[in-house]
């Protein structure tokens, strides 16, 4: 937990805004369309085996950077070894390896879930997916690996009941999380078209 007198917590969903870019939209549309075009070209130019290898490499990159942001990072070499079930004899390094592997496996699970999503419905940008992602990640970890430095055990798929700090960042007050989720669910499902969707994915 954090010490409330020493932190300024977000308690209102207006602090969440803007959920979508409000300026230079024309330029952003050009950029997002180019991303879509290049992605389509890449998918069509790679052999399926190569494409799968690229996806797995990107998963490892996602795991490395996401966990590093949260102060749980480990060396990419440690991640590669962990994927081969070769864990360090150092407890802290091994724990970070397990977190990295759980992150990668959770991403695979969620990708499979969204493989057949009709993107005009933007189901993958709802708060339900955030909760499912939380469950998919932390549900793969033993209790000791889900225990914060303050001794709080993170419950997979549950909205927290304490105020916390993630790395150097004070998270929104726990009592306001549902309001933030509600604002998210009121915004992103209204997006229409590939250009808006890609902007929404980046913003979310």
Question: What spans do the regions from the language model cover?
Answer:
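FIC/Doc superfamily catalytic core
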Residues: 1-204
């Amino acid at each position: 937990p954090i010490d409330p007198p020493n932190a300024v917590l977000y308690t209102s969903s207006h602090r969440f805004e803007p959920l979508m870019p409000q300026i230079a939209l024309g330029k952003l549309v050009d950029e997002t369309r180019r991303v879509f075009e290049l992605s389509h070209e890449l998918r069509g130019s790679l052999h399926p085996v190569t494409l799968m290898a690229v996806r797995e490499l990107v998963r490892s990159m996602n795991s490395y950077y996401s966990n590093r942001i949260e102060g749980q990072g480990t060396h990419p070499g440690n991640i590669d070894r962990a994927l081969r079930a070769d864990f360090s004899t150092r407890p802290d390094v091994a724990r970070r390896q397990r977190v990295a592997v759980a992150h990668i496996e959770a991403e695979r699970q969620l990708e499979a879930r969204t493989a057949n999503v009709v993107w005009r419905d933007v189901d993958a940008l709802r708060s339900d997916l955030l909760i499912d992602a939380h469950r998919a990640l932390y549900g793969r970890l033993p209790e000791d690996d889900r225990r914060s430095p303050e001794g709080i055990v993170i419950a997979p798929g549950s909205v927290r009941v304490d105020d916390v700090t993630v790395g150097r960042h004070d998270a929104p007050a726990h009592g306001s999380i549902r309001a933030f989720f509600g604002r998210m669910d009121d915004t992103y499902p209204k997006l229409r078209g590939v250009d808006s969707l890609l902007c929404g994915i980046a913003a979310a």
